[in-house]
């Protein structure tokens, strides 16, 4: 609809421009500028209607042109006061808006013509150029200059722009000012025509009317003022004829206007029907567009649903495969579950068995603890007894020292025995009897009783430790008796002594023949001494740092001290648990309980020494050996070990 309006406006503007050009060609000598301005400002930009009751005071061409342009108006509005309320055909979208007047429609059309790109702004220079082209005025026109100042109040020049709202407001004010100025000019023209008109003539001179009209539009009359009355009368008849002719033409024009009004009414009805049809068509088009959009949406939805269906089908196939795989896994898991249940039953049975074994082991452990407590009591008793024996040993050592001192005295006496052997023999016999009486009579018996008690205690006490080797005693091997020496040569006999560095001097430097009676006690003494040494060496090596479950090795008679450092083998039946009941510091090395052997006292028998002296000396040496014997091995530093339960 906008394009139709723009095309109709442009066609009408072109028609008017052609009519203006025709007027210029028809009346070149009758002020074409004034006629053209009056026609344009009246019909296009300034639709000022003529006053009611007034007469048409324009030339014939101007009247015809004005009537021709008035045919565009609806019926009853051509040249009337309702011309400015003429309504152009509005688009369907603008039917709800208030109806625009002819002035607003013309202004909108002018702005749209200057703004073909629909930017909403137009330069002032472009608008002025368009108005100059339409009106035919130049930039020197006062009214156009006033309009330019109104559109460009800040004097920006060629870069000034104006919007539609500003353009409409400024143009309305400018048109009102031009209409006011035009009304004053028409009042002056009417007064001038009344002065020239004759009361007997129906009309005045057409030249005077034309001059007045031209003056009202700013034109000038070049003819000389005050023509002769004769000439006026001669032209009066011509004017009357032309008036009649114009009246006939006016009647024809009235009939054509009526016909045009009827046609306009029919066209209005057709336009209304077309508008209704256009409205229904637009509604149907909108419905069709909506349906088309819905159809496109449905197509898109259908495509998406198809894609979802395909994806769901693929997912269903994949899910079915997974279900089959899961079913196989479930069967496998069921089989494994059955196996695990069987294993669980076996484990339960094994747990019950282990619980039974655990209870038995607990009972054994309690029994072992009870036995260990008893053994600890026995060991403490033995430790106290060992301490008492150690004190007794110290007393014996003191006595041994005294005896050594006495022996040294005897050696001195023996050195002097050459002078008085008889007296020496008697003194030695008396000293022997006194020494024997001084010795404790039950020393040997006490030692034997102590050994027997230890053997009975070790045999009577049941050991709580499983797989423990018992203490062993090595029986002394009998040694062959030494053969008696046939020759009475001086013999050297070694006797044990406390001090290894001390060397005894010979008792007699002269050889003395030994008698058979005196040789036999010496042999018995040497044999008993060897047996005692073997017994002492046969004691088991005790390692305080080793547990009670280890194997103990006996010390052979001919073995050295290094042989006692033998690594014991652990019994594999039970694992010992360490519990130190006696807080005793243990050394990291193994220790051997070996008998303390005192170095022997070398005595050289002189053949001149009498037999009683030798017997006395042998008796003294025997007593020294008895006193210097080491006590049997005890367990003062024995550590106790509990047993761990066997591994499952």
From Swiss-Prot:
One of its GO terms (biological process) is homologous chromosome pairing at meiosis. The chain crosses the membrane at residues 607-627. Disruption phenotype: Male and female Kash5-null mice are infertile. Testes from Kash5-null mice have a reduced size compared to those derived from wild-type animal, have a normal tissue organization, but the seminiferous tubules are narrower and present a great decrease in germ cells. No spermatids and mature sperm are observed, indicating spermatocyte arrest. Keywords: Chromosome, Coiled coil, Meiosis, Membrane, Nucleus, Telomere, Transmembrane, Transmembrane helix. Residues 473-497 have a biased composition (Acidic residues). As a component of the LINC (LInker of Nucleoskeleton and Cytoskeleton) complex, involved in the connection between the nuclear lamina and the cytoskeleton. The nucleocytoplasmic interactions established by the LINC complex play an important role in the transmission of mechanical forces across the nuclear envelope and in nuclear movement and positioning. Required for telomere attachment to nuclear envelope in the prophase of meiosis and for rapid telomere prophase movements implicating a SUN1/2:KASH5 LINC complex in which SUN1 and SUN2 seem to act at least partial redundantly. This is Protein KASH5. It comes from Mus musculus (Mouse). The lineage of its organism: Eukaryota, Metazoa, Chordata, Craniata, Vertebrata.
């Amino acid at each position: 609809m906008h394009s139709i309006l723009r095309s109709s406006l442009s066609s009408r503007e072109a028609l008017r421009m052609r009519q203006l050009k025709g007027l210029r060609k028809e009346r070149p000598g009758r002020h074409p500028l004034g006629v053209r301005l009056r026609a344009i400002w009246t019909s296009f930009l300034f639709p000022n209607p003529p006053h009611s009751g007034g007469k048409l005071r324009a030339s014939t061409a101007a009247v015809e042109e004005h009537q021709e342009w008035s045919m565009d108006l609806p019926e009853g509005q051509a040249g009337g006061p309702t011309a400015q309320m003429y309504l152009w055909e509005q688009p369907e979208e603008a039917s709800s808006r208030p109806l625009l007047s002819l002035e607003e429609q013309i202004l909108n059309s002018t702005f749209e013509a200057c703004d073909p790109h629909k930017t909403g702004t137009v330069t002032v220079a472009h608008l002025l150029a368009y108005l100059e082209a339409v009106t035919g005025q130049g930039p020197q026109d006062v009214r156009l200059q006033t309009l330019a100042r109104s559109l460009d109040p800040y004097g920006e020049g060629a870069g000034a722009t104006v919007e539609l709202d500003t353009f409409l407001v400024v143009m309305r004010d400018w048109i009102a000012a031009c209409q006011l100025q035009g009304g004053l000019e028409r009042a002056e023209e009417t007064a001038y025509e009344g002065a020239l008109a004759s009361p007997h003539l129906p009309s005045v001179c057409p030249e005077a009317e034309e001059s007045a009209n031209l003056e009202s539009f700013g034109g000038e009359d070049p003819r000389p003022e005050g023509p002769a009355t004769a000439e006026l009368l001669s032209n009066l008849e011509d004017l009357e004829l032309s008036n009649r002719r114009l009246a006939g033409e006016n009647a024809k024009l009235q009939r054509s206007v009526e016909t045009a009004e009827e046609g306009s009414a029919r066209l209005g009805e057709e336009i209304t029907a077309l508008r209704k049809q256009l409205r229904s068509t637009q509604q149907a088009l909108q419905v069709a567009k909506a349906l088309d959009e819905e159809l496109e949406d449905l197509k898109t939805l259908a495509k998406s649903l198809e894609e979802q269906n395909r994806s769901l089908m693929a997912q269903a196939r994949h899910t079915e495969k997974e279900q089959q795989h899961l079913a196989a896994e479930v069967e496998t898991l069921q089989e494994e579950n059955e196996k695990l249940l069987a294993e669980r039953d076996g484990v339960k049975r094994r747990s019950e068995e282990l619980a039974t074994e655990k209870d038995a082991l607990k009972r054994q452990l309690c029994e072992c603890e009870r036995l260990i407590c008893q053994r600890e009591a026995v060991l403490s008793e033995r430790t106290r007894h060992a301490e008492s024996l150690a004190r007794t040993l110290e007393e014996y050592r003191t006595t041994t020292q005294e005896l050594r001192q006495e022996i040294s005295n005897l050696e001195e006496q023996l050195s002097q025995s050459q002078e008085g052997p008889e007296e020496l023999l008697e003194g030695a016999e008396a000293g022997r009897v006194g020494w024997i009486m001084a010795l404790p009579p039950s020393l040997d018996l006490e030692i034997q009783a102590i050994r027997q008690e230890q053997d009975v205690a070790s045999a009577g006490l049941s050991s709580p430790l499983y797989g423990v080797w018992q203490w062993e005693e090595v029986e002394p091997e009998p040694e062959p008796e030494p053969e008696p020496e046939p020759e009475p040569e001086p013999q050297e006999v070694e006797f044990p002594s406390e001090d290894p560095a001390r060397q005894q001097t010979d008792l007699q430097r002269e050889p003395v023949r030994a008698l058979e009676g005196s040789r036999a006690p010496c042999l018995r003494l040497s044999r008993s001494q060897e047996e005692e040494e073997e017994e002492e060496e046969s004691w088991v090596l005790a390692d305080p740092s080793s547990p009670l479950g280890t194997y103990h090795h006996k010390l052979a008679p001919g073995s050295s001290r290094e042989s006692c450092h033998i690594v014991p083998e652990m019994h594999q039946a039970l694992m010992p648990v360490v519990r130190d009941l006696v807080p005793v510091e243990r050394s990291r090395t193994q220790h051997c309980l070996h008998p303390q052997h005192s170095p022997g006292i070398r005595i050289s028998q002189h053949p001149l020494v009498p037999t009683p002296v030798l017997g006395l000396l042998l008796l003294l040496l025997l007593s020294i050996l008895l006193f210097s014997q080491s006590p049997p091995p005890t367990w003062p530093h024995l550590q106790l070990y509990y047993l761990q339960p066997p591994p499952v």
